[in-house]
Amino acid sequence: MGQGSIIGYEINEKTCQISFYNEKDLQLAIEQMFIANEIPYEREVRLSNKDIIDFTVELDVGKVGVELKIDGARNALLRQINRYLSHDSIKALYVVGTPYWVNNIPIQLNNKFIYRHRILVGVF
């Protein structure tokens, strides 16, 4: 069996765990959480020819982007989210991922907030 990661989440006060091996698996897991919690979302939203964000969610403040990362370089992600936040349609961004540096990215770019959540994983 290959190596994977497990994350836990809560649906209607019930804790659940999911496994993921790559970013597409994590996208599917996040999508399942949105569905289970009846959160309206769009997946792989094209913001421009170059920019496709993993998810958008409509909140009271407007459209919020969700970008997932399980590997990659911090500076590459900063360039990517800077592009995403330059779009008028995106009011804020959630970055969710496993790299150690996720919680060290800025909390604001382009005068828009960035919310960060590092997934602490168990490898099996």
Predicted regions mapped to residue ranges:
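Nucleic-acid nuclease catalytic cores
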Residues: I70-L78, L85-R118
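Acidic-basic catalytic patches of nuclease active cores, encompassing PD-(D/E)XK
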Residues: M1-S48
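Generic alpha-helical hydrophobic packing signal
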Residues: S19, E23, E44, V57-L59, ...
